[in-house]
Amino acid sequence: YFYIKDGDTVWNPGWKPVKTELDSYSCRHGMGYTIITGQKNGLTASQLSFVPMGVNAEVHQVTLRNDSDAPKDVILTSFVEFCLWNAQDDMTNFQRNFSTGEVEVEGSVIYHKTEYRERRNHYAFYAVNTPVDGFDTDMETFLGLYNGFENPQAVFTGKMGNSIASGWQPMAAHQVKVSLAPGEERRFNFVLGYVEVPQAEKFVAPSVINKAPAKALLEKLT
């Protein structure tokens, strides 16, 4: 999901999950891509999503344009929930799954490395091509107690927890504060990627994962 906070109004380009009524909405599917566009209170948000050929990554290019006559200060928040590599097990084996989640944050890149140290040679990552103003990797910190995806605490308050998940439900969210003059447009590339590392190259130092494959992939896409 991508959340937009414009003043006191929170909305999504694709309507869900907040379900704020939009002034306009469109969804277009082409050959290998989808463009979702929403408009609310003079702000247009467009999400171009595609999987580039030959890489294990999904790209979401988010464009914000101020169509009003006044400057706007908005907050763009991304969100993905990481799986634990087995969809069936994710939904059933809670007594184990809630103890294994592990992440690492480096700049604007959030690495999901659950079980990488113990028995896996692959990890996932979620990145954006701009410095971030905050992040979260722990679901409860992001949503807030008893909240759902329609009203995440971090989005509605505009304050991320900069949480580092240790077990429970690992996820990734970036907060980007954007100032737009009338008519100005800004574009951001979010990349959700997956890499596999040869067993002998898993670590570059004790307990330090090999991030080189992820960084090489990001150089191509951002």
Residue map of PLM features:
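Anionic coordination/interaction segments
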Residues: 1-222
